Amino acid sequence: MINDVISPEFDENGRALRRIRSFVRRQGRLTKGQQLALDSYWPVMGVEYQAAPVDLNTLFGREAPVVLEIGFGMGTSLVTMAANNPQQNFLGIEVHSPGVGACLSSAHDAGLSNLRIMCHDAVEVLENMIPEASLDMVQLFFPDPWHKARHNKRRIVQTPFVELVKSKLKVGGVFHMATDWQPYAEHMLEVMSGVSGYLNLSEQNDYVPRPDSRPLTKFELRGQRLGHGVWDLMFERKE
């Protein structure tokens, strides 16, 4: 599970298959609690990557709206949302194993049955595992902004990714993004506005107020006290 975050980067002839990725693989050191959670709860809540579509109703054992979160960090907000919305199914994707372990532990403590976790490249999951027009919401909160200009190409929000997300959303489904880096917020808005088939849910056609459905993190609360801004964007699939 942990050692298969990305698919092979070379084909059988040794040709590079690698694409530009929005994350850097850093294994990190697992605490004893995180390792215990991985050993104990991954068999219940963990989902192994496969290069074929998965039936989401079968995955969760029921039919319900599905929310996909990309890059959930330590899982605090994701677990809170899943606990607050038992009528929805939540699928979280994170590439760093300490975060996966922490999220599994918190989800177990909360007694959640509507949360599944993956440890893999989210782009590959979207491309190969998620059926077309199957998601009610995709959440991307505080992705790496890749501040330096020469690294901007690593930002996950690019036109091909936005098109991919749209294809996986149901008509009426929503792509919700949040960032605390204004240049990235402006980049998100520019990219999203350039892709047809989306409707910006902002009345001013830019950013929306933070919806109550997105919990405030400790990091965000600290930023607010320091006067830092946060920008939320919500776009609905219209076609």
From Swiss-Prot:
<dbReference type="Pfam" id="PF02390">
    <property type="entry name" value="Methyltransf_4"/>
</dbReference>
<keyword id="KW-0808">Transferase</keyword>
<feature type="active site">
    <location>
        <position position="144"/>
    </location>
</feature>
<keyword id="KW-0949">S-adenosyl-L-methionine</keyword>
<feature type="binding site">
    <location>
        <position position="94"/>
    </location>
    <ligand>
        <name>S-adenosyl-L-methionine</name>
    </ligand>
</feature>
<feature type="binding site">
    <location>
        <position position="69"/>
    </location>
    <ligand>
        <name>S-adenosyl-L-methionine</name>
    </ligand>
</feature>
<comment type="similarity">
    <text>Belongs to the class I-like SAM-binding methyltransferase superfamily. TrmB family.</text>
</comment>
<comment type="pathway">
    <text>tRNA modification; N(7)-methylguanine-tRNA biosynthesis.</text>
</comment>
<comment type="function">
    <text>Catalyzes the formation of N(7)-methylguanine at position 46 (m7G46) in tRNA.</text>
</comment>
<comment type="subunit">
    <text>Monomer.</text>
</comment>
<feature type="binding site">
    <location>
        <position position="180"/>
    </location>
    <ligand>
        <name>substrate</name>
    </ligand>
</feature>
<dbReference type="InterPro" id="IPR055361">
    <property type="entry name" value="tRNA_methyltr_TrmB_bact"/>
</dbReference>
<keyword id="KW-0819">tRNA processing</keyword>
<keyword id="KW-0489">Methyltransferase</keyword>
<dbReference type="InterPro" id="IPR029063">
    <property type="entry name" value="SAM-dependent_MTases_sf"/>
</dbReference>
<feature type="binding site">
    <location>
        <begin position="217"/>
        <end position="220"/>
    </location>
    <ligand>
        <name>substrate</name>
    </ligand>
</feature>
<dbReference type="InterPro" id="IPR003358">
    <property type="entry name" value="tRNA_(Gua-N-7)_MeTrfase_Trmb"/>
</dbReference>
<feature type="binding site">
    <location>
        <position position="121"/>
    </location>
    <ligand>
        <name>S-adenosyl-L-methionine</name>
    </ligand>
</feature>
<feature type="binding site">
    <location>
        <position position="144"/>
    </location>
    <ligand>
        <name>S-adenosyl-L-methionine</name>
    </ligand>
</feature>
<protein>
    <recommendedName>
        <fullName>tRNA (guanine-N(7)-)-methyltransferase</fullName>
        <ecNumber>2.1.1.33</ecNumber>
    </recommendedName>
</protein>
<dbReference type="GO" id="GO:0043527">
    <property type="term" value="C:tRNA methyltransferase complex"/>
</dbReference>
<feature type="region of interest" description="Interaction with RNA">
    <location>
        <begin position="150"/>
        <end position="155"/>
    </location>
</feature>
<feature type="binding site">
    <location>
        <position position="148"/>
    </location>
    <ligand>
        <name>substrate</name>
    </ligand>
</feature>
<dbReference type="GO" id="GO:0008176">
    <property type="term" value="F:tRNA (guanine(46)-N7)-methyltransferase activity"/>
</dbReference>
